[in-house]
Regions:
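Short secondary-structure boundary/capping segments
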Residues: 8-9, 80
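Short His-Asn-centered micro-motif
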Residues: 6, 20, 91-92, 129-131
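Beta-strand-turn-beta hairpins that frame and shape the catalytic cleft
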Residues: 9-19, 88, 138-143
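Active-site-proximal loop/helix segment associated with metal-binding centers of metalloenzymes
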Residues: 15-105
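Glycine/small-residue-rich loop that forms an oxyanion/phosphate-binding "nest" at active or ligand-binding sites
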Residues: 1-5
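Short, flexible micro-motifs
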Residues: 10, 24-25, 133
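Conserved beta-sheet core of the metallophosphoesterase superfamily
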Residues: 94-153
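Generic structural microfeature
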Residues: 12, 84, 122-123
Length: 153
């Protein structure tokens, strides 16, 4: 098992992989609860009954879901080091253009925009990503995986 860290490049069986994990939670419109708050249990069950869209800090949501400034900088350094070329790019969410092809109403954010810059500049064979709960191939090179396992090498 290999833990592919954000903003790193890996050589696996002669293939280069660039990785950049992370994604914004889109089911937190009603807030993020503090599990240590005095009224946590009451608020939690109220929000469940009301079918609110929320998460619980450090249980179902972490601020580290998105890359830090240091991780973005490290990713750019890595891409420079490998000449902006990889056989495979592996991310959790997709670049802006692909997000909008999936669903024009999906929200773009700092990470999807960062990935869009990579999409425009990098040379790659395939881009594999998840997050959007579907299995699809978009524009021949972008592979959205959800319930599928695919062999790539």
């Amino acid at each position: 098992m290999i833990h592919l860290l954000r903003g790193q490049a890996f050589e696996i069986e002669g293939y280069t992989f660039f990785t950049m994990g992370g994604a914004s939670s889109h089911d937190i419109a009603d807030g993020i609860l503090n599990p240590y708050a005095d009224d946590f249990e009451e608020r939690y069950w109220f929000m469940r009954r009301m079918r609110c869209r929320f998460r619980v800090n450090h249980y179902s949501w972490w601020k580290e879901e998105l890359p830090s400034d240091e991780e973005y900088a490290e990713a750019l350094k890595t891409l420079e080091r490998i000449g902006w070329a990889a056989d495979y790019i592996v991310t959790h969410c997709a670049p802006d253009r692909i997000v909008k092809k999936l669903n024009p109403s999906y929200t773009l954010d700092r990470l999807t925009t960062f990935l869009e810059k990579i999409r425009r500049k990098a040379k790659f064979h395939y881009w594999l990503f998840a997050h959007y709960h579907d299995n699809r191939i978009i524009d021949e090179r972008y592979v959205l995986l959800w319930e599928q396992i695919v062999q790539i090498i």
